[in-house]
Amino acid sequence: MREMGTGDSASRLILWFCLGFLILGVGFVQCGVTYDRKALLINGQRRILFSGSIHYPRSTPDMWEDLIQKAKDGGIDVIETYVFWNLHEPSPGKYDFEGRNDLVRFVKTIHKAGLYAHLRIGPYVCAEWNFGGFPVWLKYVPGISFRTDNEPFKRAMKGFTERIVELMKSENLFESQGGPIILSQIENEYGRQGQLLGAEGHNYMTWAAKMAIATETGVPWVMCKEDDAPDPVINTCNGFYCDSFAPNKPYKPLIWTEAWSGWFTEFGGPMHHRPVQDLAFGVARFIQKGGSFVNYYMYHGGTNFGRTAGGPFVTTSYDYDAPIDEYGLIRQPKYGHLKELHRAIKMCEKALVSADPVVTSIGNKQQAHVYSAESGDCSAFLANYDTESAARVLFNNVHYNLPPWSISILPDCRNAVFNTAKVGVQTSQMEMLPTDTKNFQWESYLEDLSSLDDSSTFTTHGLLEQINVTRDTSDYLWYMTSVDIGDSESFLHGGELPTLIIQSTGHAVHIFVNGQLSGSAFGTRQNRRFTYQGKINLHSGTNRIALLSVAVGLPNVGGHFESWNTGILGPVALHGLSQGKMDLSWQKWTYQVGLKGEAMNLAFPTNTPSIGWMDASLTVQKPQPLTWHKTYFDAPEGNEPLALDMEGMGKGQIWVNGESIGRYWTAFATGDCSHCSYTGTYKPNKCQTGCGQPTQRWYHVPRAWLKPSQNLLVIFEELGGNPSTVSLVKRSVSGVCAEVSEYHPNIKNWQIESYGKGQTFHRPKVHLKCSPGQAIASIKFASFGTPLGTCGSYQQGECHAATSYAILERKCVGKARCAVTISNSNFGKDPCPNVLKRLTVEAVCAPETSVSTWRP
């Protein structure tokens, strides 16, 4: 074991200082947060900490307490959040900290739960958030250049950072004041951007660090993905794996600020899933190397309400395949397996923070990391890096079986209490179920294209960049011009129609010719620039061409935000006329920001004039583009999370009682959904689902936004969907599965005082649990033996205990939860001696009121 060095001495001095004051009867002493090369020290004590990202504006305030408590119950110590500048300062000097923007309330809720907080001020956040969290008005500060050594930008950034720090200080929220905030972050993932900028980037990064330190928060600052972070700022890692990361100084701890629990979804793409076996493997690899702080990005992803989604093309759902899903429900097995991982690692904490690992080879692709402390504490991590084969290894004269791509954790260097690949918790099957809400009665309002040239428009020569015109007050900008066609044009006499070609910098465009939709075109997140090319039907005389350019979230990654373009910058040209090509780019164009319905505030309950609304049955017969639909509904009974099923619609936006649910788009997902394995390096395209289906079909409707009755639902449809297909559904657990082997690791089999001695073997159990208000209605599958398949498609194998169904029905049906011990005696006899068996179960969950309590 290596000597701990000066960092260890410093931590002991801090600890003795604190204890000395307590012994002298001085009372409570706040010793603050410091660090050494092993870990963060809180009040002088080194800590292994697990953190979870929960972004306050991506859920509603009434959800915060439950989300944070679920995180705590899952073994989380710290809640991490970005701070979103564009929410808090929507216009220069005017601040908003109300509702979902109530940062103080969120941090106090963390404190109330007894957890710590990590405040990532940025103020650049990325986060798949509109404009990376920057307010768009910042783009128009004279002389500004983003994220570089630029005085206007630094002045604005300093002002906002200091405003947030002072707000936290005024509420005593830093740990140095007795609050929960133990870490703060300045900038975000700047390393690559700084390299591109050279000296200016380095100067800016150094300035940002000094500016942050000068705020005197009393807690450490971090910079993620910034190898040159100057002392005392800690540089940290983001990624799917961080076991190869090392801080830039030997006296700084290994901190993983973003352990990606999944990945975000983009319109037109599939959903991404990261197997929990691989996520647990990545975390265990980081800890076995000496890591002491892991933050799951995300632990609860939530929803991109309103127009907050960035990308562009990032979906309204920001579920992220996180342990707590978009709706605030626990995602199993990810939540439970990580909870067991946290518990196992915390058993090793004394050894982990007191020693350095001794690494030895125990096979061709297997290693042991052993932590032996002077106190006698010993913990070991046995790793199998082979992606194909399990390994049987010898460690401390004991054999251990390691599945492929897995790590076993031995808190006492003897008993394996956890293996990253052996999932013993249940899998919960989630479904969207009908509610008792009656069929919606719709009214519709058509955008009047003939009234676009009113006082809200302006005319100029040439094509203008979209955000410079809209200032991001709307997704929509009209580009309108006229084309005169002579009687002699050949296409008027049976010839080929002319072709309109439009080059756009993003993100979508709808083409109207003389008031009729002629075509649409869309970019993608990878290629936001696109070209539209289509035949158009013109008549003799003056023809009106109206192009509705649509933004689908502003980009959130990169530098020089001031230079980014959106909208139609051309060229725009007609081909196939008698004169050949007619370039329309530099003629007069008339512009209108937003839609008429937006100007009329049609989405708000107090602004829904009856003039212009018609019975939707008239529009359903022939769906029209650019149509507003409204209806009223009563809140469904119960407390299950709610969503709108938008499968029959096209693209647009949704509001409930004036609150924006967000953008919807039922674009079909393309990708490869054919294969998924937990083994091997994870990438977002590895485990995908939803190919050939709408990228996002369901849209979260927070219950906090509903009244008991007469809730106003407004939909703006760009393409012409059918509102009669829209329905309100509830998210609930429909069934649970579990599969546990005879010798599954059991934490009960570990007691530190029995190290090296024989002990009673505690047999593993299958645990099944439905959601609150539910009970197990039936057993769909049960087999103790060698069953085959996966959850939802199990089959009996060659070995099967005939009593399996009867045992599970007797112990579980009619109950909200049950546990069944995996033993031969429990099932009458050994169905296949000398064969490793497992108990596999699939159960159906239903409301308690509908489940009979009778059991055979």
From Swiss-Prot:
It is an enzyme of class 3 (hydrolase). It is found in: Secreted, Extracellular space, Apoplast. GO terms for cellular component: apoplast; plant-type cell wall; plasma membrane. Residues 1-31 form the signal peptide. Ubiquitous. GO terms for molecular function: beta-galactosidase activity; carbohydrate binding. PROSITE patterns: GLYCOSYL_HYDROL_F35, SUEL_LECTIN. It catalyses: Hydrolysis of terminal non-reducing beta-D-galactose residues in beta-D-galactosides. Keywords: Apoplast, Glycoprotein, Glycosidase, Hydrolase, Secreted, Signal. The active site is at 189 (proton donor), 258 (nucleophile). Residues 760-846 form the SUEL-type lectin domain. Its main location: secreted. SUPFAM superfamilies: (Trans)glycosidases, Galactose-binding domain-like. Glycans are attached at residue 468. GO terms for biological process: carbohydrate metabolic process. This is Beta-galactosidase 3. It comes from Arabidopsis thaliana. The gene is BGAL3.
